[in-house]
């Protein structure tokens, strides 16, 4: 192991000098033993020549000074993988942070790995039922697919993610890996206790690099979580990988890029934005051994879906769930936009002709209502034809029937959550669009599960 010394510290960036010809490679991990309890890890980012390497710190660089000894580990950051990680909370380096003692005898993987080759990859068209009406109907998820939850601040990304975890991870017999990338520590804490109460903690591995961590940590924590998921997949398991939030991964890359002195590109993002996103996303894939189904929350800055970060993420996904501030403002939750959300699985050959026809009819009805809104605002409902009046009435019922109470929001709403089977969802919307419930008031459709609940509620109105 070669030993170097610190020659320069600028925030999270540390320059280390090694003997000429004995310097570490790019992405190698360096260890600083400063005499305190923990040791700080650095990751090599650039070779500056003359034996000097520029590194990013994986923890706080407070207290570092020039002349401190740095030891090269000779390989990239390695993290524990396998059964021992289940039920544990780890940081970017794979160290336990849940005060439950060390992680037992373990296999370790490097966090920088190649994506599976073309021959190894497999695609699946099996559907993953979520129990959320609007998702199952409009943008169905594929087992082994990549799903993005897009939304601005405060429209419900994390609540939707938690509901999906509740409905899928608890019912799903496989394993889950939850990666918190630059999000609130409180959310990570809530998630841990929720899983514990549900009795599924022994099927979940958690990796957290939260908002207060330095950028190097937030940039690498997604890779740590993915590496743990890859190990389970390679053992032939079906894994759920939850990433909250993929935008913070991009943001950490922007910070690191600026610290390293690279020229920024559009909107101040790093010039390597597409490559960094590709390196992560291409590894999240299913092979002939096992599958990784990934659900990622994507923050949309200023509600602008054309921002380079969400726009780059779009290209990698099989299904996109777009959360709308306008729908949230109407008090319709989940605030998922059925006209903006898409899925590659919404194909008659995958979901069946009936499902496809009902989903498209729902979208056509809502689209026509959207077009008529301007006329209604100027001239009022009376100026519409009888057919359009009927369509508007049905569209408003469809909008309300797309809402449903969530299990994870029970504590706020006081209304018990519901899981709606796909066949009930299709049957309900089909009957609604065929005019079977034209005489039922629209408020009866608010926050119900299947159509039977609507009929029960209508009797009480």
Swiss-Prot record:
EC number: 7.1.2.2
Residue ranges the record marks as coiled coil: none
Location in the cell: Cell inner membrane
SUPFAM superfamilies: C-terminal domain of alpha and beta subunits of F1 ATP synthase, N-terminal domain of alpha and beta subunits of F1 ATP synthase, P-loop containing nucleoside triphosphate hydrolases
Enzyme class: translocase
First-listed, main subcellular location of the protein, grouped into a coarse class: membrane
Domain of life of the source: Bacteria
Keywords: ATP synthesis, ATP-binding, Cell inner membrane, Cell membrane, CF(1), Hydrogen ion transport, Ion transport, Membrane, Nucleotide-binding, Translocase, Transport
Binding site for ATP: 151-158
Reaction catalyzed: ATP + H2O + 4 H(+)(in) = ADP + phosphate + 5 H(+)(out)
GO molecular function, one term: proton-transporting ATP synthase activity, rotational mechanism
Membrane topology: Peripheral membrane protein
Listed GO CC annotations: plasma membrane; proton-transporting ATP synthase complex
Subunit structure as annotated in this protein's UniProt entry: F-type ATPases have 2 components, CF(1) - the catalytic core - and CF(0) - the membrane proton channel. CF(1) has five subunits: alpha(3), beta(3), gamma(1), delta(1), epsilon(1). CF(0) has three main subunits: a(1), b(2) and c(9-12). The alpha and beta chains form an alternating ring which encloses part of the gamma chain. CF(1) is attached to CF(0) by a central stalk formed by the gamma and epsilon chains, while a peripheral stalk is formed by the delta and b chains.
Function summary: Produces ATP from ADP in the presence of a proton gradient across the membrane. The catalytic sites are hosted primarily by the beta subunits.
Similarity annotation: Belongs to the ATPase alpha/beta chains family.
Protein name, entry field: ATP synthase subunit beta 2
Name of encoding gene: atpD2
